[in-house]
Amino acid sequence: MTRTDVLNLTIREAAAQIERSALSPVELTDAMLQRIARVDKTLNAYITVCGEQAREVALAAEKMIRAGYHLGPLHGIPIAIKDNIYTRGVRTTAGSKILGDFVPQEDATVTARLKRAGAVIIGKTNLHEFAWGGTTDNPHYGTCRNPWNPERFPAGSSGGSGAAVAARTCLGALGTDTGGSIRLPSSVNGIVGIRPTIGRVSNHNVVPLAWTMDTVSPMARTVEDCVLMFEIIAGHDPLDDHSAQAPVPDYRGELGRGLRGLRIGLIRDYSLSHVQRAVGDTIRAALTTLESLGVEIEEIAMPSIQGNISAQLTIESCEPSTYHQEWLRTRPADYGEDVRTLLELGEMYLATHYLQAQRYRSVLRKEFVEGFKRVDVFVTPTLPFTATPCGATKVMIENNREEDMLSAIMQFTGVPSLAGLPALSVPVGFDADGLPVGMQVIGRAFDEATLFRLGHAYQQATDWHTRAPSL
Amino acid sequence: MSPHEPVTPESIDRLCTLADLPVPAERRKGLALMLAGLVAAANELSRKMADARYRTVVPILRFPER
């Protein structure tokens, strides 16, 4: 097997080869580390590369497997972890100067579960400072770049995880998603990312952004690989007060069920409105493919959907500013300019603004509950535009009108975040400049299985996910 | 702060005093420009949520709901 073949393996493919000793975890880890050495000077996807530690773990995995002990599909698989998720003994900066020297004494629950499953933690990925922003233009650890075009942004805040997976420097990664921070980079880097139902995956020992919206979850090149990681990290955690007791289904068992009879909802005057033409055309083509697989599509009105961006900005302003209150007074100069500004602004909302935004969430959630009586999932683009140039603070979506990046980037991903619903981003094509387009699929609370089933069926019928950036 | 008045650097000064947040004078103009837009949108949402049809709606502050 050539080096290129190894780099292009999915988790499922690599796991199958490792299990039958056709591929060594050490060989796989070394290939990833060499790939990081070659491309990450350009991409800046990693804040810390755990080279020596990763090799030791890979060697131990190899010995275990040779001795007849195979821990499952993540055994010996190189995985990257966003740098706001605790890793015992490995610096966890949250992309900040403030936590620049923080070395946790404990793992996050998600890290511990991946390690128990035999995963090889290959490094900690770059992010927007404290996950508060959507560009991964990090003033402390450098601007992260998009593997499909390094002049373009990888989105964020989990931009390092998105770029690392797309660039074949790891087989999967963990990200965090508050208002879209897994789905946005998954979309613009041409990979798959799932935001889980709040409570499905533990947030224990993850640096918070907004407590009532934060989630942790996988990013990978295929839906099936996301499932392999999700199965390991999902489930109740007594260390997290927000963790749900809901049983975790057999996601892999559900994947092959097909889509016949599945009902997709498009939200009237929203799902396909105010998007770049290439994005709209690509999503419509994806819907046509899904219809050929047996889904039915229905348009549904959701009158409360307008107002979602203000609600999200209000909550995502007030909650981080509460967490950062002390540092903002004692170390204001240690924040990057954009995050410092957002944290200062978050102190200037009224309590009534915050509570009205939380009441809005109840209304929005109720409309989704009603909508789910008629359809199984809702579809939107993940973003209304493709990757913008690095450093851009404005974006043009239609009519040659410039819009503020922060509001524009939340147009579609904020809605499931507010409603507490799971949402999957799956790659569905490219624009004329060769930049990926992602489709967001929103599901019922705790019904990630249907999202995985739809995304997997789509990937079985298309080949977008097999294309690689030419780095 | 009235929704009909623009947010000014002086408004920022007053809010910072209330929040016990020291913000250097040179930052206040930029913050005022941004806050004007954010507060206008938040006030619009508040007016919507004050409508009688939403009178019984309570905030979600915890997921999963109990």
What role is predicted for each listed range?
Chain A
Residues 32, 54, 76, 82, ...:
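Conserved hydrophobic/aromatic pocket- or pore-lining residues that grip, position, or stack substrates
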Residues 97, 101, 140, 242-246, ...:
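Short, surface-exposed loop/helix-turn segments at secondary-structure junctions
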Residues 52-62, 118-119:
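Long amphipathic alpha-helix in the N-terminal Rossmann-like dinucleotide-binding domain
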Residues 12, 38, 116, 166-273, ...:
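Structural helix-boundary/capping segments
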Residues 74-216, 269, 380-401:
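Short glycine/serine-rich loop/turn segments
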Residues 1-56, 292, 467-471:
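An N-terminal boundary/leader segment
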Residues 25-30, 59, 113, 277-301, ...:
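Acyltransferase
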Residues 74-94, 252-268, 315-369, 381-385, ...:
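Short helix-loop capping/hinge segments that flank enzyme active sites or metal/cofactor-binding pockets
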